[in-house]
Every structure is written in structure tokens, then in C-alpha cells.
Design a protein with these regions (language model features):
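Glycine-rich, flexible loop/turn motifs
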Residues: 5-6, 11, 19, 123-126, ...
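Gly/Ser/Thr-enriched, mixed-charge loops and adjacent short helices
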Residues: 125-256
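N-terminal small/polar loop signature for handling phosphorylated ligands or for N-terminal nucleophile
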Residues: 44, 52, 58-124, 219-256
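Fold-independent oxyanion-binding glycine-rich loops
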Residues: 13, 115-118, 132-133, 208-209
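An N-terminal, well-structured beta->alpha segment
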Residues: 1-76, 166-204
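Gly/Ser/Thr-rich beta-alpha loop segments that engage phosphate groups in nucleotides
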Residues: 16, 64, 93, 128, ...
Length: 256
């Protein structure tokens, strides 16, 4: 019987690993098999927590702009579809947007998976997991890993008949979240002179840090009346807007 050791992939409350070749001495340890088993582990964990059959779950999956994102997303979506989970393929997205897919009523996902490795080198990737309570904590990730390492758990999740009949559904989450950001910016800015375009006359600088967030600068319509919109540095005062925009909170729990 093959033994699995995925504990080395745990980085606090995230999964992080080497997803592609390219750096000497760093072998791939987050490939299709690891992704398959971790995804089934998450589905089982979510089913247990919600006391809900796996085939009744709805899970969204999205990713940042990393080179391995599409392959990992395909593996995750196929894995979930084959065990009967309703899957929303959100494509390019941001971490806060993926959390909000559990909150927006037209999505109402039981859980979400964000494929990202934040600031790590190009050959790395990883997973952030969410439910309606926020980002999973270290203990939750440890439980998912234990399930992923268990053949009894993985093999007990039966493939549904004709899984191709219900493929992953593509959803424009980045557009929906952009609308959400626009509404929050209008609300927080409270510009009585330009209520629908509260940033009119301002010079705004947006720094996406090579991440997916840069697309929101184009999609959030309230930017369009600003003078000389640019990219390259942090948006001053964005903290207040981010807080209002639904950033995912960490669930209380042991983090050490």
C-alpha cells in the first residue's frame, strides 16, 4: 500500500508546493495526484462539517496568473465533478473574490478553492480554502491533509454515473466582484457632488503586484472618470475600502 505524506505541503493555513520544473534541485511535489487527493480531502471535510452529502455540495474554483494555474484548476474541477459536486469555474480571480463566492446569493457556494502561491517564485503554487465562515485555519488544513492521505476516505468518495453530464459551469466572478467593489467604493467615499462617480477628479494609482487584482482597475466603472489612472504604486487609503469589500477573515483556531 502506497503511503502519502502531504504534511510538507502545509504552510500554516495554506497549501504550498512546487508545481512545475524550472529550478534546479526543486522537484514537483504539487502535481495532479496531490491535487486530486487534496481536493477530495477538502470535499470530504466540507461534507463532514456541513453534514451534507458530497453530491449536494457547491464549490467554486479560481486562480491567479501563475503558469500552472490552468492545469491545477482543471484537475480540481474534474475531481469535484466526478464525485457529484456542483462546480463553478471562476477562472482568473482574486482571493477576496473567491471568498465572496460563498456570500453572493447568486453563487452561494458551500466552499471555494483559490489557486495561488502569493509572492512565491514562479515554479510554486498552492491552494487557499474557504467556506462561509472565512478562510480555513491550520487545524482545518491538517484535517484535510489527513483525509487526503487516507485511501479509505479517498476511495469511499464514489464516482457518480455519467459525471460529464454536469461539467463545471463558467462564471464571471471577477465581473461580479468588480460590481461589489464599485458599490463599496461609492458607499465609503460618499461624494455628494458626484454620487455615482465619487473618484471624479482624483489621480489614482493601482499596484496589482503582478496579481489578478489589476483587472479590477479596468472593471470597476467608478475609476473611469479619474484623471490619469496609472499603475505601479499602492492606492492610498485602500485599506478602508478593502475592509468594506469583504476580505476573507481567518477562522479562529490554533495557528501555531
Amino acid at each position: 500500500m502506497k503511503e502519502y505524506d502531504y504534511k510538507k505541503l502545509q504552510n500554516g493555513s495554506d497549501i504550498r508546493g512546487v508545481a512545475m520544473d524550472g529550478v534546479p534541485g526543486e522537484n514537483v511535489n504539487l502535481g495532479k495526484e496531490e491535487t486530486f487527493r487534496l481536493t477530495r480531502g477538502f470535499a470530504f471535510w466540507l461534507s463532514e462539517k456541513l453534514e451534507k452529502p458530497v453530491e449536494s455540495l457547491k464549490i467554486s474554483v479560481g486562480h491567479d496568473s501563475r503558469l500552472t494555474a490552468e492545469e491545477l484548476k482543471t484537475t480540481i474541477a474534474d475531481t469535484l465533478v466526478h464525485i457529484g459536486v456542483k462546480v463553478y469555474d471562476c477562472g482568473l480571480a482574486s482571493t477576496p473574490a473567491m471568498f465572496m463566492s460563498t456570500i453572493f446569493p447568486e453563487y452561494a457556494c458551500d466552499g471555494a478553492i483559490m489557486i495561488t502561491a502569493s509572492h512565491l517564485p514562479f515554479n510554486r503554487n498552492g491552494f487557499k480554502y474557504f467556506d462561509k465562515d472565512g478562510g480555513l485555519n491550520k487545524a482545518d488544513i491538517s484535517a484535510i491533509i489527513a483525509y487526503a492521505e487516507s485511501d479509505a476516505v479517498i476511495e469511499n468518495l464514489e464516482t457518480v454515473p455519467n459525471p460529464g453530464a454536469n461539467p463545471a459551469e463558467k462564471r464571471d466572478l471577477i465581473g461580479r466582484y468588480s460590481q461589489h467593489l464599485r458599490e463599496k467604493i461609492i458607499s465609503e467615499a460618499a461624494n455628494t457632488e458626484h454620487p455615482d462617480k465619487p473618484l471624479t477628479g482624483l489621480k489614482i494609482v493601482v499596484d496589482a503586484g503582478n496579481g489578478a487584482g489589476g483587472f479590477y482597475a479596468e472593471n470597476a466603472e467608478c475609476w473611469h472618470e479619474c484623471k490619469q489612472p496609472k499603475t505601479g504604486a499602492a492606492l492610498r487609503g485602500a485599506g478602508k475600502i478593502q475592509k468594506a469589500a469583504g476580505r476573507p477573515l481567518r477562522r479562529a483556531g490554533p495557528q501555531a
